[in-house]
From Swiss-Prot:
Disordered: annotated segments: 485-513
Name recorded for this polypeptide: Protein disulfide-isomerase
EC number: 5.3.4.1
Gene Ontology molecular function: protein disulfide isomerase activity
Family annotation (CDD domains): PDI_a_family, PDI_a_PDI_a'_C, PDI_b'_family, PDI_b_family
BP GO annotations: protein folding; response to endoplasmic reticulum stress
Residues modified by glycosylation: N279
GO cellular component: endoplasmic reticulum; endoplasmic reticulum lumen
Site (Lowers pKa of C-terminal Cys of first active site): R131
Record-linked InterPro entries: PDI_thioredoxin-like_dom, Prot_disulphide_isomerase, Thioredoxin-like_sf, Thioredoxin_CS, Thioredoxin_domain
General function of this protein: Participates in the folding of proteins containing disulfide bonds, may be involved in glycosylation, prolyl hydroxylation and triglyceride transfer.
Organism: Zea mays
Length: 513
């Protein structure tokens, strides 16, 4: 399927749910309290402008994880209201129709999403802390304090630096000058992701050389080489150094929540991605892990990220990529052009050779597609990857196509509505309503599918428009009648790069992830 950065984010949110160690039962929603501000599209901007630091939860009333968060968020808000100065927590029902513009503006891809608004909205960052009251309180107290803390002694370092987390320290001869200013700027930008400190003495730190030429940035981490240094204080270079150094050479995809931040970075990266999936509990795991780690070391100078995933924890990824458990052990490469390369039933001693073939351009991409249906006489036509271009772009017709997932509740609700609309338009030979299972078929690059259901309207001339109107049969029929072009049966073509996409996604969140 077409995989763009926002589509990856949708996958990441699904992975975050899969990695949650909390129980899945639905708790009762928290009683409405006064500590959390309730905002809507009319009051939002005024509230942001009023508060130098404000935290906002974007939620949906039907979202189970939002219900689970509600009492914790309320209790945290009560505790933080006593902080000096008070830390304000707010919430927005992003599922309410009038508030949809806020969800679009702030790129809300799933529920709940929490964002930190600093400097009266001039600086907006993702909340990446705990989801229970005490953890929320501790995390936000850190966020409202200085972006980097001074380390004056080894005892300070012991108190601030967690051996299981990444910690970034600037080592200076004095706390002034361009290097210090740039370091503090980067610390402010990345403070929701990492903890920062600054010191005059490298020997206060638990790892790394004590005798250093200052200034220097030292990054301490719980994986690979444990400590890396850089002397480049250019802001862009420092950001790049941190980005490259804060992901393991091989990311592990299992149920350990400590690995979740590395998974987020892995899937957010624009670099090609190699993913090895197998059963972690079986005997060959150790030999595969050793061989895969050696391959990652051998190709560390190539622009590619490596992940090893446990079958049990990777069901969301299997569903997303259309993989099957009986194909494991398997290795999948997703490159920057959305091409995929797959080797199923791979042996540990085949990994390096297969990766060399990839880098040498000798592998053939593969495409997920269900079989083309032999019978396709229902009102809503079934389209698969192997015939989508012929059906949508070369038919000379106006095609409304839905990209759906079989498990998606909103898709199930929409199905009879599309059937009704298709039946109403059945006598119009210039119009077709179709659907594609986006979990079993690769979506063409002409369509940006970020969630389910996603609908697009394609005209005979190749104009591609996202459908963001109402979800009744009458709404759909009216839209098609107003938007359709006169069919051109003798002018069939594939628009390719010249296809025009119009419209914006008014409903970025399509289902609870």
């Amino acid at each position: 399927m077409a995989i763009r950065s926002k589509a990856w984010i949708s996958l990441l949110l699904a992975l975050a749910v899969a990695l949650s160690a909390r129980a899945e039962e639905e708790p009762a929603a928290a009683a409405e309290g006064e500590a959390v501000l309730t905002l809507d599209v009319d009051s939002f901007d005024e509230a942001v402008a009023k508060h130098p630091f404000m935290v906002v939860e974007f939620y949906a009333p039907w979202c189970g994880h939002c219900k689970k968060l509600a009492p914790e968020y309320e209790n945290a808000a009560k505790a933080l209201s006593k902080h000096d100065p008070p830390i304000v927590l707010a919430k927005v029902d992003a599922n309410e129709e009038k508030n949809r513009p806020l969800a679009t503006k702030y790129e809300i891809q799933g529920f709940p999403t929490i964002k930190i608004f600093r400097d009266r909205g001039k600086n907006i960052q993702e909340y990446k802390g705990p989801r229970e009251a005490d953890g929320i309180v501790d995390y936000l107290k850190k966020q409202v304090g200085p972006a980097s803390k001074e380390i004056k002694s080894p005892e300070d370092a012991t108190a601030l630096i967690d051996d299981k987390k990444i910690y970034i320290v600037g080592i200076f001869a004095e706390f002034s000058g361009t290097e210090f200013t740039n370091f503090m700027e980067v610390a402010e930008k990345l403070r929701s992701d990492y903890d920062f400190g600054h010191t005059l003495h490298a020997n206060h730190l638990p790892r790394g050389d004590a005798a250093v030429e200052r200034p220097l940035v030292r990054l301490l981490k719980p994986f690979d080489e444990l400590v890396v240094d850089s002397k480049d204080f250019d802001v862009a270079a420092l950001m790049k150094f941190i980005d490259a150094s804060t992901i393991p050479r091989v990311v592990t995809f299992d149920k350990n929540p400590d690995n979740h931040p590395y998974l987020m970075k892995f899937f957010q990266s624009s670099a090609p991605k190699a993913m090895l999936f197998l059963n972690f509990s079986t005997g060959p795991f150790d030999s595969f892990k050793s061989a895969y780690s050696a391959a990652a070391e051998e190709f560390k100078d190539k622009e590619i990220k490596f992940l090893i995933g446990d079958i049990e924890a990777s069901q969301g990824a299997f569903q997303y990529f259309g993989l099957k458990e009986d194909q494991t052990p398997l290795i999948l490469i997703q490159d920057g052009d959305s091409k995929k390369f797959l080797k199923v039933h791979v042996e540990a001693d085949q990994i390096v050779a297969w990766l060399k073939e990839y880098f040498d351009g000798k592998l053939t991409p593969f495409r997920n597609s269900e079989p083309i249906p032999e019978v396709n006489n229902e009102p809503v036509k079934v389209v698969v990857a192997d015939n989508v271009h012929d059906f949508v772009f070369k038919s000379g017709k106006n095609v409304l196509i839905e990209f759906y997932a079989p498990w998606c509740g909103h898709c199930k609700k929409l199905a009879p509505i599309l059937d009704e609309a298709a039946t109403t338009l059945q006598s119009d030979e210039e119009v077709v309503i179709a659907k594609m299972d986006a979990t079993a078929n690769d979506v063409p690059s002409e369509f940006d599918v970020q969630g389910y259901p996603t609908l697009y309207f394609v005209t005979p001339s190749g104009k591609v428009t996202s459908y963001d109107s109402g979800r009744t049969a009458d709404d759909i029929v009216d839209f098609i009648k107003k938007s359709k072009e006169t069919a051109a049966p003798h002018h069939h073509h594939h628009p390719g790069a010249t296809g025009i996409r119009e419209g914006s996604r008014a409903e970025p969140v399509k289902d609870e992830l």
